[in-house]
């Protein structure tokens, strides 16, 4: 929970706790802890939302959110839902981290065995995960920005995999991004 507030301090200064405290005892604990942590960060606005309402708001008003903190089950569901705003599960990075020790950066999607070997997997979530790692674990915002800018320019240029409406293969998209990174 504390990491959510620390992250919000570097962004738009807002944290939303997503839980189901009206039903689940574990969510009541989450809410109690989050309210305590919120007091340590008076400069960060904080609210809480039940997961069913959050699912609706993510689609109807995604701009209302900055940093969402939630338990794994709800996070898995909401991140898959939110990926549809970008057009594909294949674009979204994720981070799992605690107060100490290493963090895990990975795409939110699974291994996609149904498209294995076809050369059509979207590489953006993996590339965006690397950018997130450079930013959060190595404090290399400059490199992270080069990567994300290159990803965005590649998409804007129309080089995308089929899940985003394009016809490019995984390697073509990856190589286009690498070329843009090298040019920047």
Give the label of every model feature segment.
Residues 1-52, 64:
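Glycine-rich phosphate/diphosphate-binding loop of Rossmann-like nucleotide-binding domains
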Residues 58-158:
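Glycine-rich phosphate/nucleotide-binding loop
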